């Protein structure tokens, strides 16, 4: 049996730009891509915490240490500068691989710099 699991997450990324006329995609600071293990052109799922929009696109590189998160093309209608996003990637695993796998969780500040990382989401309590 195969299961799709969270591979990586950029938590609370802040949109810095929207570029409607750009050729689709989401440009992400190259340091963030590398730290999260996201490949250029890899499919990403974006969850907009500000307005509730959810959409799928692909990642492209933005300048190192720029803090850029630019939502481009048609997806630019789904975000505004200042919106907070969760950007996720997923991977398919065999059940035998699941126990040893841990996702890369990258937590960001208001300027899209890394505050801390992790590999487990805390248990939600009442």
Curated annotation (Swiss-Prot):
GO terms for biological process: alanine biosynthetic process; pantothenate biosynthetic process. One of its GO terms (molecular function) is aspartate 1-decarboxylase activity. Coiled coil: none annotated. It comes from the Bacteria. Catalyzes the pyruvoyl-dependent decarboxylation of aspartate to produce beta-alanine. Belongs to the PanD family. This is Aspartate 1-decarboxylase. It comes from Nitrosococcus oceani (strain ATCC 19707 / BCRC 17464 / JCM 30415 / NCIMB 11848 / C-107). The lineage of its organism: Bacteria, Pseudomonadati, Pseudomonadota, Gammaproteobacteria, Chromatiales. The gene is panD.
């Amino acid at each position: 049996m195969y299961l799709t699991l969270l591979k990586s997450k950029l938590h609370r990324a802040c949109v810095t730009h929207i570029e409607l006329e750009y050729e689709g995609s989401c440009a992400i600071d190259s340091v963030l891509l590398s730290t999260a293990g996201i490949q250029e052109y890899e499919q990403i799922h974006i969850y907009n915490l500000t307005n509730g929009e959810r959409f799928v696109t692909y990642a492209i590189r933005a300048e190192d240490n720029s803090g850029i998160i630019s939502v481009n093309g048609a997806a630019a209608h789904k975000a505004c500068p200042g919106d907070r996003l969760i950007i996720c990637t997923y991977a398919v695993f065999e059940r035998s691989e699941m126990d040893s796998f841990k996702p890369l969780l990258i937590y960001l500040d208001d300027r899209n710099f890394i505050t801390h990382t992790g590999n487990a989401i805390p248990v939600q309590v009442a």
